[in-house]
Regions:
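Ordered alpha/beta subdomains of enzyme catalytic regions
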Residues: 1-114
Length: 114
């Protein structure tokens, strides 16, 4: 049996920058888009779930406040950028991320909608 060695991003269990809680391919895609001139291109991303949990028959729209807070506070620390550099992200992309702040629009169902 082959074992897989999983290296944590940061060994500090108390470090919790949500910007770094993502699939790594999202960073590689963003770096590629940046390098190919798409830095200022408007793009759309969706936050959704595929099915109701526990075979439930309905869903309630909730959590928009937390999502807005996440988007407004989205940033990368020096620690994050140093790590991303070790994973091959370009210097230009890392410079961009160092000052990145979300400035998009958010469309959502009204909180509490069934």
């Amino acid at each position: 049996m082959t074992s897989i060695n999983v290296e944590p991003y940061i060994s500090d269990e108390d470090y919790d920058n949500p910007a770094m809680v993502t699939d790594f391919y999202e960073f590689t895609m963003a770096n590629c888009l940046f390098l190919h001139g798409y830095k200022d291109t408007v793009m759309v991303f969706d936050m959704f779930f595929r099915t109701n949990p526990d075979n439930g028959g309905y869903s309630i729209s909730a959590g928009q406040h937390q999502l807005v807070k996440f988007l407004r506070e989205y940033h990368f620390t020096e620690r994050d950028l140093k790590y991303l550099k070790t994973k091959g992200m370009s210097d230009e992309f890392l410079e961009y991320l160092s000052t990145y702040r979300w400035k998009g629009d958010m469309y959502a169902l009204k909180e509490g909608t069934v």
